[in-house]
UniProtKB/Swiss-Prot annotation:
CDD domains: SpoU-like_RlmB (cd18103). GO terms for cellular component: cytoplasm. The keyword Transport does not apply. InterPro entries: Alpha/beta_knot_MTases, rRNA_MeTrfase_TrmH, SpoU_MeTrfase, SpoU_subst-bd, tRNA_m1G_MTases_N. S-adenosyl-L-methionine binds at residues 198, 218, 227. Belongs to the class IV-like SAM-binding methyltransferase superfamily. RNA methyltransferase TrmH family. Its EC number is 2.1.1.-. This is Uncharacterized tRNA/rRNA methyltransferase MG252. GO terms for biological process: methylation; RNA processing. Pfam families: SpoU_methylase, SpoU_sub_bind. It is an enzyme of class 2 (transferase).
Length: 242
């Protein structure tokens, strides 16, 4: 069965050029005459395009910094199968993967993608359901980082964890719930690990948290209850990287 198409848009020249440079298949480019210098490139790539007025862009993409260039693409092409990710990491002595358990905010998802690229994570795993998809906001917030990473969308996180544990990965869940007695994140020394972060409100699924090899927290001033998920992820990943 074919996957249903998930379409998204790229806005602006820089995002469009990054997509072209990464051989991303673009279905359609909506463009204004101010970008006429790009038309030979678009034609050479055999991409369908339509020329529109400034008013058209402002009406269609209100409140978005469209820059009068909007490229439409199928986001499924940005994903790789789990088996392909396994081949990438199975023979590595050290590797870090990030797993997202039902992230809902597209700005968080986009920021997470940027952080993972900057910290040289080997792959990002997220759910097909109850998870914000790679939409326009995610694409824009990721600042092009979506094109340079191993992105895996799965139906079942627990099954995925089992597959990765078979090739030497350990699971590390980020949680502030004292019932799990999380340790300082700086004490983790697994060579191959999956950092699992959860939903902005509920955190990581209880069963996944219970079965984790390690549960961690970021020690904080007691006047602060929690950190944004993308901020917390960045603190942990860069500490591990360095």
């Amino acid at each position: 069965m074919k996957k249903p198409r998930q379409q998204s848009c790229l806005f602006g020249v820089k995002a469009f050029e990054e997509a072209i440079n990464n051989q991303v298949h673009i279905k359609l480019v909506n463009i204004s005459i101010r970008h006429k210098k790009l038309i030979p490139l678009i034609e050479a790539k055999k991409i369908n395009f339509q020329i529109h007025s400034t008013n058209w862009f402002n009406n269609q993409y209100r409140d978005i910094n469209h820059q009068e260039l909007v490229a439409v693409l199928d986001t499924n092409q940005l994903l790789i199968p789990l088996d392909q990710l396994v081949k990438v990491v199975e023979n590595k002595k050290c590797s870090t993967l990030v797993m997202l358990d039902e992230i809902q905010d597209p700005y968080n998802f986009g920021a997470i993608l940027r952080t993972c690229l900057a910290s040289e994570v080997d792959g990002i795993i997220f759910k097909k359901n109850n998870q914000v998809p790679i939409n326009n906001t995610v694409m824009k917030t990721s600042m092009g980082s979506v094109f340079y990473q191993n992105l895996v969308q799965v139906a079942n996180l627990s099954y995925t964890i089992t597959k990765l544990k078979e090739i030497g990965f350990w699971t590390v869940v980020s949680t502030l719930d004292p019932i799990w007695k999380p340790i300082d994140y700086r004490k983790v020394d697994f060579a191959k690990k999956i950092l699992i972060v959860g939903n902005e409100d509920r955190g990581v699924n209880q069963l996944i948290t219970k079965n984790a090899d390690c549960r961690i927290k970021i020690p904080m001033n007691n006047k602060i209850n929690s950190l944004n998920v993308s901020v917390a992820l960045g603190i942990i990943l860069f500490a591990w990287k360095n």
